[in-house]
Structure formats: C-alpha cells, structure tokens
Amino acid sequence: DQRQQLLQRSALGRRLIEASQRSPLEFVEQEFEHDAVRAGLLFFNGLREVDLRMHGFGHSIPALLAGSNMAQMCRGGAVALAEALTADIREHGGEIRTSAEPQSILMQNGRAVGIELTDGERLTSEGFIASGLNPQQTFLKLLSADAVPQTVREQAAGFRYNLLAPLFGLNVALDEPPQYSAAEKHPELNDAFMVILGLERLDQFHEIVTAHEHGRIPPTVMWGACPTVFDPSQAPAGKHTGFMWEKLPYAVNGDPKNWDALREEHGRSMLRLWADYAPNLNEVVLDSFTRSALDTERSLPNMQFGDLL
C-alpha cells in the first residue's frame, strides 16, 4: 500500500517495517540485553493490552519509547472525569440513561434507527445509532440474524479477548501514604507516580502467560499508586488512598466463580507483598476492598471475561 511504499524509500522506514513484522517479545529479546530492562519494557507494553507474542506488533516497543504520552491522573479522581464528560454531553443537548439495558437494535430499510430496552421502551434517532458494546453483544445478540451478513456473524462469534487483559484490583484507605524501605537511599521513591512490585526478570512474563493459559494464579507482579500524594482532594483531610492492580486469569482454576472464594485472600496476599516493600502499611491500613475480573464483568457486562477493552 502507499504507506509501505513510502517507508521503503528510507533506511529508517525499512527498519520500521522489519520491526513491525516481529512480535514485541521477539523485538525485546533481540534488541535489548539486560534482563530487568527487557522485563520492564514488556511489562509496560503489556499494560497497553498488546499480546506480546503477536507478530505484527513489534513496532509497539519503539513506539512506547518514542511516545510522549505519560501516565496521567484526573484531579478529583476518575469520577470527576466522568462527571465532566456527562456535563458536557448534557450541555450540548444530550441525554444519558443509566441502568437501562438494551434488548435489540431496531432496523428499518436496512439501517439501524433505534434501540429497544428490556422494559419495552423504544428510543429512535433520525441520525445514526452507534454501539460501544462488544462484538458478540452487538452483532449476535442485539441485531437480528437477517440484519447481519453471515461472515460478520462468524467473525463476531470467533472474536477472542486478550488473554492477559483481566485485572484484579486491591484498593486501600490509609492513615498515611506508603513509606518504601528503599526510599532511605532513594527518597524520590516515596513520590513515585507509579510503582511496580515483584518484577525482577524476563522469565516472569512467560510464567504469567502460562498461568493465564491454565487458569492459575502466577507469582504476583503488580503496579499501582497512592493518588492522594498528588491530589489530597481524593480523601478526607490527612488521610490517603492507594491501589494495586495485577493481571490475573478470568477463569481461575477453571471457573470464574472461584474468585468469590479466593478474592479476599488474594487481596491480603497482595497487601503483604506491598508491605514487604513499604513496612508502614502493616499499621496504617484503615480499610480495603478487592475487585476481580468476574466482579468487573458482573457490573459492566460489556466487558466480557473482564476484558477492559
């Protein structure tokens, strides 16, 4: 295509084409030597929900290094961002419905003209109808079979979610922020915007993938932050909040419902590991709660298998 032709004209362009043909894992193993650097690059790339074994995505590693985008946090918390977006929609004449479950997409003369809710209400539009739901919900559940080409239905049925996408979350209310032991020599660590714990070597990536493939819980590698260090408005005066996330399989031990019995103990395990690095957490945790990939799917059904995308 035109892009390929343009890239072929320069050495850097040809280099990009060559890198793109590899998987992120191959790129890191072939271009970097230090085990910790390899592990870190793969971990950060994995946070972007790219399957690190997938050929055709090798360029995602140099794109990660060259990109100007940094981790960000919304002042007031994620709810403040949601409230700002909804306020803007309403200001421009839009309407938002919550707890309204769609039953079908209404079709007329070969085009979508509205949706019908499970309570029987119909909402129509003279403009266009857009779906932000997953492929199975949109093309197999909400649209009738005669409204979707068979090839599209087959593609939707065959869509596979990212093996490493599901997240497990530990959230804590604190009397004070974590104080890391390593900060005695490197005080800036207590002001880190993001902390990664448990990541030591490249082989851990393979162990995590294998654990996900077999529905097992791998040795913990987690990342998180203490948002109130940067935005005190997210907690009562003098108090703090913190969180850690870990990529864990949806169907743990073969069945996602197993998370109901395992969730709290795994959260305690994460907190113990966190306290190994920040010992004051043994004394300052006021309360905590956990959230598994199954919990995500239960509250947000469009995130099938807990896939956040």
What are these regions (language model features)?
Residues 73, 103-235:
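Mid-domain catalytic core of redox enzymes
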Residues 34-49, 217-225, 279-309:
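A glycine-rich dinucleotide-binding beta-alpha-beta segment and adjacent secondary-structure elements
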Residues 136-141, 173-175, 196, 208, ...:
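Conserved FAD/dinucleotide-binding core of flavoprotein oxidoreductases
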Residues 107-112, 144, 257-259, 291-306:
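Short glycine/threonine-rich loop-to-helix capping motif typified by GTGT followed
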